[in-house]
Amino acid sequence: MATSGTYVTEVPLKGSADKHYKRWRDENHLFPDAIGHHIQGVTVHDGEWDSHEAIKIWNYTCDGKPEVFKERKEIDDENMVITFRGLEGHVMEQLKVYDLIYQFSQKSPDDIVCKITMIWEKRTDDSPEPSNYMKFLKSVVADMDEHVLKA
């Protein structure tokens, strides 16, 4: 049986949790202009930008290498949670399960957090653990912070 695991981290943010949630929920098309050093393109494959179960294709750079990721988005507005379920792409060559969960919380007027949870399962025991992807995701969320504040 292949190894599986869960990584969890929190990224402190500025502004409002609602504004950050809206950017991640509805405005993925703005990511390449805002953080092009991480995300070079996002296209809708099926559905709409803001629709539950929309399928999108992301072009990004992780560890200096261009990669592609196809995901299905799940939305939980009540809890300000967005889940991207991995379907295809570079990361899916090594992982059988790759779910990314972003939860935005306004703890106080000056204390906003994005909790990132990555649930993963390797295809084989020989595949590396995806810790580099968690580092990448944390950097994407942190770098998007300034752009959300300016919006």
From Swiss-Prot:
GO terms for biological process: defense response. One of its GO terms (molecular function) is copper ion binding. SUPFAM superfamilies: Bet v1-like. GO terms for cellular component: mitochondrion. InterPro entries: Bet_v_I/MLP (IPR000916), MLP-like (IPR052006), START-like_dom_sf (IPR023393). Belongs to the MLP family. This is MLP-like protein 329. The gene is MLP329.
